[in-house]
Amino acid sequence: MAFNLQSFLQKSGRSLRVWNRTLSKASELESVGAIVEKNGPKALAKECDVLFSMLFDDAALKQICEEVTAAPPKKDLIWVDCSTVYPATTKEVAAKVQSHGVRFAACPMFGRPDAAKAKLLVGAFAGEETLKLGVRPYIEAMTRAIIDVGTEPHHGTTQKLCGNFFIASCIEMISEAVTLADKSGLSRQNVLDFINTMLPCPVIQGYGTRICEDNLAISPSNPGFAVKGGLKDVGLMRRLADETSTKLHIADIVYEHLEKQLEKGHGDLDWGSVVLSVREESGLPGEVEK
């Protein structure tokens, strides 16, 4: 995300300031002209016109919120949060920062790190209309598409959880189909041929290939979304389902399968490792080389 945004800003003569808890990650952007802000979110909130954040969980977002409001923030600062968090957390953070004069929107992103690098992310954008109009060019610089989810920021994170439910369900579906094929004498290539012919979309093709090839380890050259992150996101879906009295049976199954992988020490594998749990339940080996 940040590399594409830096490229866009550089062309328009503007600068990008970056911060990461792991400063070495932020430093990678220095080589393309970004400025590393070593003094953290408070300094960014004081100096910047627009602030983008991508944080792991609700606790991290709330901590950054405390720092932004304590800065104090620059007048009319716009903050666009791209994290996958619980909608009530988005609503809470929005109310708090807005009381300090900050204009807040949510634009959580669909896509793994490799999609971000290739500018293939999809954003679920929610916030006041004039704000969205003003920062849309920045988001377009980081995405291939934007889904407008209205004026309430928490609807952006609700959209993200609904979308991630689709993705998690696809992973479970592929895992079960591949396991059925394995046990019934079909080749995995037969499964991939069906996917590529009948269901040619990036999510199903991508995870279909990854699962069929047992390509579950994550590395810098083979990015993915880890089991630990999957548990967090599916946990948020289930929490929202409980709060709204909605049955998400597939989410419950995926959560159980991810928990099994975490218990086996596979927390850093891609969440496509759901297939290992399905295989084990079906009497096949449930291990793969990391």
Question: Model-derived features: where do they sit?
Answer:
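Glycine-centered short loops/turns at secondary-structure junctions
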Residues: 12-13, 33, 101, 185, ...
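Hydrophobic beta-strand scaffold residues
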Residues: 16, 36-37, 103-105, 146, ...
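Glycine/threonine-rich flexible loop motifs
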Residues: 55-67
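Rossmann-fold dinucleotide-binding core
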Residues: 84-168
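Helical "substrate-binding/catalytic lid" subdomain
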Residues: 155-281
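Helix N-cap at the beta1-alpha1 junction of Rossmann-like dinucleotide-binding domains, i.e.
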Residues: 23-24, 58, 129
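NAD(P)+-binding Rossmann beta1-loop-alpha1 motif at the extreme N-terminus of oxidoreductases
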Residues: 1-53, 73-78, 83, 92, ...
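Buried hydrophobic positions in well-ordered alpha/beta secondary-structure cores of metabolic enzymes
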Residues: 1, 29, 48-51, 61, ...
